[in-house]
From Swiss-Prot:
Organism: Human astrovirus-5
Transmembrane segments: 154-174, 239-259, 286-306, 313-333, 344-364
Catalytic activity: RNA(n) + a ribonucleoside 5'-triphosphate = RNA(n+1) + diphosphate
GO-annotated cellular components: host cell membrane; membrane
Gene name linked to the record: ORF1
Biased composition (Basic and acidic residues): 783-795
Chain positions of site Cleavage: Q175, S176, Q419, S420, Q664, K665, Q755, A756, Q913, G914
Residues in RdRp catalytic domain copies: 1161-1287
This protein's name: Non-structural polyprotein 1AB
């Protein structure tokens, strides 16, 4: 092939075409056969080099040329080979930078392909294993023998026997016989009528004269108890006529026997006990002694009762001897069993002896029954004696809002900065040396360095804890060692011997800080910025647009001499640490001998001074050395806060002085027009919404939310003003006045509920070649409506900002630019048909601008439908929408999404179905079918029927997110005990256990005084709800992305779709229907929650259930309670309920400080189990009644029947399960109602007030010394004192009175608030929040229940975790792992808008609302 066609080993080799083409032409078949084993499908570099430069050669052969080939190997190395005429000989490798970069990418691609191949093989193997296991499972099931079911169940035989036994019980009474005739019956009837008429006349006269006495009232009650109101010929009279022949014990025994047969696990033992109780005559007295018995003592009692039936004296003797014999002969048992057996024998002796005495004296055992019950009650009541208590909870998920803050100096500073305008002036030319810069690459990220002397200087935080770093200079990578890091944020790296920079920087001998220059490499581009600097001690500050990767850059004067090292990265304000010649060399530390000598001399001086003046020694004892050795974390925090306070004060003073000329108020200008600056615009604005904060704890925030969060921080610092537009929304007008009681709506009128509200300043983006729509919304564009000063500002920035004047043709764009990810999905025939509208529906602009492209796309669509191959559609539609965007038209994919058509794969609403069967609240009743198989409803709940629904009851999905392959392997494995929930039918059944623990008593009757005190405390605490209003249903707000329940969920996946289709008419119609007196029964939909929980709970099928109601029903609840809920959120800082609480911007510390400032000695953290489900229904209804009493008096009476209907449907819920089963729930506070959290807060507080009165009595003065914060079932309290055995007593009280569950260990009482938890955060020494369960957060990252859409989402989630871990220990495994993951994902992002990581200053602004201060 010499002098023939060039040789290429593969297609990539031909594409790259590295090296000499002449060398490729010299390749012969022998040379090709003997080629080294380079990487398959990789490029090589061919060189044609003089032979004498490679092989030792003399004579004419010196100038002959040989072929040299350079390529890469499988192990990641590369080499060069020369052909000596016979074979390829390896020579010293020749460096080719382009080849090295290409080989690196090829190796990475090959590694990914190999990983994909292994994953596919593993998947195929696992699939085959699953099939084998399925076949084996079927085979084993066939081998299991199925027992023949009994033809007649044994329990029915037992029931028949019991019924026969009870029917033969003698129960007659001897009565006198009377002879009656028809005349005597007529006389008796007339007499009864006359007496009844006389009584009625007397009663009416007394009513007319209002002369009702107490005896009359007692007679009325007596008549009611005697059923005197029942007519003589009523069927109840007949029932009572036959029942009175039986004693009460017989009836009770009959009912108890039936219940025993149906539900008892030991029906034989229970029935024998009933029979022996009846035969012996002890009857009711036996029942209260049952809990004292064991199995053995129960049979002893049954035997003695049978013996008593035949010989009572023998039975009494044996009963008295039984405890004595038991004490002797059962002493071999362990203590717990021994005590239980003896207690049962003593109970037996008391029953036999006492029962015999009662039967002998009175003929019945009723008195013994009363005595035993009284003893049990006294024993139970003595457990709850206590003095004081306070309770606090810890593990809730909180929704965040920003607290209202008063106007202060810092706020005025930012507002003055907004009014100041931009700087003007002319900067001089500066000297820069790009050849003196390099890039420092570490596993944690990249930074900038510069050459000075024999060292490479950079920032210490760029180097981190690494001993060796990679230095990238002019495309080559060198490994260098970190030489020295002083106390400043500076690091000195030894320059490698083979690195020869073209320029070096020198230190400035006469520093001039008036104007500084910062130069650095950002994304391989050199960036330079000049600014005026301010000196603050050993640091500089200047206003530059700092970017990631600039840390460590040199800060030079105008002559190019180094002044400082750039270190701060907050996005706007830059900072640097001044570098001195003394920083280059470490200070020699004194030897150990010298240190010991100094220590001895210092101790001698202290001894001498102590003898002369002891007080002086005490005050002057600490020295510099000891101070450094005794510094703790709190001291460091205080020092940093002091430094930040001093820096901010200096910075504010300097800026105010510079901006003073611009702050003069012009004459004749009131500045109250539409363009005025709203100083209190951020007052009351949420940093995060409640839903977003809850997501933050579980799964992080999305990209847009994080960008808005960072924009708010930057906006505060950069000082862009917010402007009022023409439709400015007055925040003082809360809208309550528009919803009067008698407002009538015309349903035919189209009502526009949109309201213009102020929008934040737009985000500043990089300049683009063509004007973007963001340019039209920049704050400077609105400055034409300002005064002359702002017009001058606009002229200053004119060269750097796009102008609105003279737009070019088609320069405007519609919406956002199309993104390829939105088009890259599996297209089907429906997508292809609906992507383009019919030709008559195209606009004239579409035909003129996009006509040819639309015709081309129609051809592609027709071909795709015929061949059923839609792979070409995404790219074609994307190109069309891209052209439409550039022409200022709406994209066709966006048009399809904006048509509000019914969601895909959902049924359309049946046209023949009436409104009452589709929109009404009880539409489900007409679809209800008879009950069938019970699959997901437990046996102790009724099965009302089945509804046609297509929903899965199995979920075994554990997604595998490929993006997690970018993250490093974790070394901390505590997260493995958590995982995403999966379930089957058993999980639905077990989820109903949340409603059961213990049965509550009638505490309103048993403890009326304590309940009255709890009511007083609740009315006092929530008195700000007085005179709240019912609002109109169209003015309510709720989450419209929720499931609209059945049957609307068959046709719409969200309430938003339902509202778009039908508007407010169904809502108003159903509200009017209820208002007129109708009481429809609402259907709730139940589903299990997909979340991260412990694997043990998943194995036990312990998954939380969620119920949601019809959106119309929820909106009606919002009408009644939205005003109160809004007020509760506004009073978060002063009230106990933290429904509007936010841990951000100092909210957490302010809340904790509130409890600490109370001055009490103890702090209590309290936590319930199954709180929502075990709330007593009577208490829940009572709290709802308290809330309703706060409503305006007129509206309270007008809408009372609506409120009663609403609460009835909360407590008696008809629930639909995904299996189609319909059941009834009558317990707990449903999680899907409109005011779940607010109701839980009030119940939590009411229970605490009840506990206080229970332990301390209704002491109102003492109650005022307590303070508490609650959120749902979370509670954190402070109290002056705590009684002994507080934990045991309060646990027993909740179980026995309210039937609520508090586990041991969930009540924590300490003398310090540090270490206690509230809403998922643990309080540290600085009252800052630390995540209580970081292992759960790590599980949600590495074992998610939902795959993240893209890399930006993963990076945003990591930023959320960095935010949550802000106050964790620096060496905590979770925090270290998050930082490591951020360094990985930041390298893969390109122009995403998200920061590589949140800086320390940004974290402080988010958590504290500003820089770290000395006062916290």
């Amino acid at each position: 092939m010499a002098h023939g066609e060039p040789y290429y080993s593969s297609k990539p080799d031909k594409d790259f075409n590295f090296g000499s083409t002449m060398a490729r032409r010299q390749m012969t078949p022998t040379m090709v056969t003997k080629l080294p084993k380079f990487v398959r499908n990789s490029p090589q570099v061919y060189d044609w080099i003089v032979r004498g430069l490679i092989f030792p050669t003399t004579g004419k052969t010196y100038f002959q040329r040989v072929v040299v080939i350079t390529g890469g190997f499988e192990d990641g190395t590369y080499g060069s080979f020369a052909f000596d005429g016979r074979e390829w000989v390896e020579i010293y490798p020749i460096e080719h930078l382009n080849l090295m970069s290409s080989l690196k990418l090829i190796h990475k691609a090959n590694a990914l392909q190999e990983r994909l191949r292994l994953s596919q093989e593993e998947k195929a193997t696992l699939t085959l294993d699953v099939q084998f296991l399925q076949h084996e499972n079927v085979r084993l099931k066939e081998l299991i023998s199925k027992p023949e079911p009994r033809k007649i169940q044994m329990k029915w035989i037992i029931v028949g026997a019991v019924l026969t036994f009870l029917s033969l019980i003698p129960g007659g009474y001897a009565q006198s016989q009377t002879n009656n005739t028809i005349f005597t019956d007529v006389i008796a009837a007339c007499k009864y009528s006359t007496e009844t008429l006389t009584e009625n006349l007397d009663l009416r006269i007394k009513l007319a004269l209002a002369n009702i006495t107490i005896s009359d009232k007692l007679d009325a009650v007596r008549q009611i108890l005697n059923f005197a109101f029942v007519p003589r010929s009523h069927w109840l009279r007949t029932v009572f006529y036959y029942i009175h022949y039986y004693e009460m014990w017989n009836i009770f025994m009959f009912v108890l026997a039936i219940g025993t047969v149906m539900r008892s696990t030991r029906p034989g033992t229970d029935l024998i006990t009933l029979a022996t109780s009846h035969l012996s005559g002890f009857r009711m007295a036996v029942l209260p002694t049952i809990p004292f018995h064991t199995t053995m003592t129960l049979w002893v009692m049954n035997t003695l009762m049978v013996c008593y039936y035949f010989d009572n004296l023998l039975a009494i003797t044996m009963a008295i001897l039984a405890p004595i014999l038991g004490i002797i002969f059962l002493c071999f048992m362990e203590d717990s069993n021994y005590v239980s057996q003896i207690r049962g024998l003593i109970a037996t002796a008391v029953l036999i002896a006492g029962g015999h005495a009662c039967l002998t004296l009175t003929g019945t055992t009723t008195s013994l029954f009363v005595v035993i019950l009284t003893c049990r009650f006294v024993r139970m009541a003595t457990i709850f004696i206590g003095t004081r208590f306070e309770i606090r909870d810890a593990n809730g998920k909180v929704v965040a809002t920003v607290p209202t803050r008063i106007k202060n100096a810092a706020f005025d500073f930012f507002q003055r900065l907004k009014q100041s305008g931009v700087r003007v002036g002319v900067n001089e030319f500066v000297v820069i040396k790009p050849g003196a810069l390099c890039v420092i690459d570490t596993p944690e990220g990249k930074g900038t360095g510069f050459f000075s002397g024999n060292d490479i200087v950079t920032a210490a935080h760029v180097v981190g804890n690494n001993t060796f770093v990679n230095v990238c200079y002019e495309g080559l990578m060198y490994e260098a060692k970190v030489r020295y890091m002083p106390e400043k944020d500076i690091a000195f790296i030894t320059c490698p011997g083979d690195l020869h920079p073209t320029a070096r920087l020198k230190l400035s001998k006469n520093p001039d800080y008036s104007c500084v220059t910062v130069m650095a490499y950002v994304n391989e581009d050199l960036v330079v910025s000049t600014a005026a600097a301010m000196v603050h001690g050993n640091t500089l500050s200047y206003a530059v647009r700092t970017q990631d990767g600039m840390s460590g850059a040199p800060v030079c004067d105008k002559y190019g001499r180094v002044l400082a090292v750039h270190q701060t990265n907050t996005g706007y304000t830059g900072g640097a640490v001044i570098i001195d010649p003394a920083d280059f060399h470490p200070v020699k530390a004194p030897s150990q001998v010298e240190l010991l000598k100094e220590e001895i001399e210092r101790l001698k001086a202290q001894l001498n001074s102590a003898a002369e003046n002891p007080s002086t020694v005490i005050t002057q004892q600490p020295t510099a050395t000891l101070e450094q050795k005794s510094v703790n974390d709190s001291d460091v925090v205080d020092l940093v806060r002091t430094a930040m306070e001093r820096e901010m004060k200096i910075l504010r003073d300097e800026i105010n002085g510079i901006l003073a000329p611009f702050l003069q108020k012009k004459k004749g200008k009131t500045k109250h027009g539409r363009g005025r600056v709203r100083r209190n615009l951020r007052k009351g604005v949420k940093l995060l919404t409640e839903e977003e904060y809850r997501e933050l704890l579980e799964k992080g925030l999305d990209r847009e939310t994080f960008l808005d969060l960072i924009d708010r921080i930057i906006g505060e610092r950069s000082g862009y003003p917010d402007y009022d537009d023409e439709d400015y929304y007055d925040e003082d007008d809360d809208g309550w006045g528009m919803v009067g009681d008698d407002v009538e709506f015309d349903y035919t009128e189209v009502i526009n509920f949109d309201q213009a509200k102020p929008t934040p300043a737009p985000r500043t983006t990089k300049p683009k070649p063509c004007p973007e729509p963001e340019a039209e919304t920049q704050p400077l564009d609105l400055s034409q409506k300002k005064d002359k000063q702002l017009e001058h500002e606009q002229q200053v920035v004119k060269p750097t900002k796009p102008q609105k004047n003279d737009p070019q043709p088609y320069s405007q764009t519609y919406g956002k630019a199309p993104i390829w990810e939105s088009y890259d999905f599996d297209w089907d025939e429906d997508d292809a048909k609906f992507i383009l509208p019919a030709p008559p529906r195209l606009t004239k602009a579409d035909e003129i601008v996009l006509g040819s492209k639309i015709v081309k796309l129609r051809t592609i669509i027709e071909t795709a439908i015929k061949t059923q191959n839609y792979s070409a559609l995404p790219e074609a539609v994307f190109e069309l929408d891209k052209a439409a965007y550039e022409a200022g038209l709406e994209g066709f994919l966006q048009r399809v999404k904006s048509k509000n058509k019914a969601p895909k794969k959902l049924q359309r609403a049946p046209e023949d179905q009436g409104a009452q069967n589709y929109h009404s609240l009880d539409a489900w009743k007409s679809l209800l079918e008879p009950p069938r198989e019970r699959r997901c409803v437990p046996a102790n709940f009724p099965l009302l029927g089945h509804l046609p629904i297509d929903r899965p009851i199995f979920d075994d999905k554990k997604p595998r997110d490929d993006l997690l392959g970018l993250l490093p392997e974790p070394t901390w494995h505590a997260f493995e005990e958590y995982g995403p929930t999966t379930w089957g039918p058993q999980a639905f059944i077990k989820s109903f256990d949340k409603f059961f623990y213990a049965e509550p008593i009638d505490f309103f009757s048993e403890y009326p005084q304590l309940c009255a005190f709890a009511d007083w405390a609740t009315y006092r605490e929530f008195r700000y709800l007085e005179d709240t209003r019912v609002i109109h249903i169209t003015a309510t707000e709720k989450n419209t992305d929720s499931t609209p329940a059945y049957p609307k969920m068959n046709y719409f996946d969200t309430e938003e779709k339902y509202l778009e289709s039908y508007g407010w008419a169904p809502y108003i119609r159903e509200f009017t229907r209820v208002f007129k007196g109708d009481k429809p029964e609402v259907l709730w939909y139940l589903f299990l929650k997909k979340e991260i929980i412990k694997e043990e709970k998943i194995r036990n099928s312990d998954i939380r259930q969620i119920v949601c109601a019809d959106p119309i029903y929820t909106r009606i609840g919002a009408c009644l309670e939205a005003h109160q809920n809004a007020l509760m959120k506004q009073h978060t800082e002063t009230s106990v309920g933290q429904c509007g609480w936010s841990p951000m911007e100092g909210g957490f510390k302010k809340t904790m400080q509130r409890l600490v400032n109370k001055g009490n000695k103890y702090f209590i953290e309290f936590d319930w189990t199954r709180y929502d489900g075990t709330i007593p229904p009577s208490l829940f209804r009572h709290i709802k009644e308290i809330r309703w009493n706060f409503i305006n008096k007129d509206q309270r009476e007008k809408y009372r029947h609506v409120h009663e209907w609403y609460v009835d449907n909360l407590l008696n819920r008809h629930v639909l399960l995904p299996s189609g089963e319909v059941t009834l729930q009558t317990r707990g506070n449903p999680s899907g109602q409109f005011s779940t959290t607010m109701d839980n807060n009030m119940i939590n507080f009411w229970l605490q007030a009840f506990e206080f009165a229970y332990f301390n009595g209704p002491n109102k003065d003492l109650w005022k010394t307590y303070d508490t914060v609650v959120y749902g079932d979370d509670r954190l309290s402070t109290t002056p004192s705590v009684p002994e055995n507080y934990e045991e007593r309060v646990i027993d009280m909740y179980r026995d009175i309210f039937g609520m569950w508090v586990k041991p260990g969930k009540v924590i009482c300490r003398e310090s608030i540090v270490g206690l938890s509230f809403c998922g955060f643990t309080v540290n020494a600085d009252l800052e929040p630390v995540p209580t369960s970081p292992e759960k957060l790590m599980a949600s990252l590495l074992k998610p229940y939902k795959i993240l859409p893209d890399l930006e989402s993963l990076h945003g989630k990591l930023l959320c975790y960095q935010l949550l871990a802000a106050f964790m220990a620096e060496d905590h495994p979770f925090k270290v792992y998050v930082e490591h993951c951020l360094s990985r994902t930041a390298k893969q992002l390109r122009d995403s808008g998200l920061p590589a990581r949140l800086t320390e200053e940004q974290l402080h602004r988010i958590w504290r609302g500003g820089p770290k201060k000395c006062d916290g």
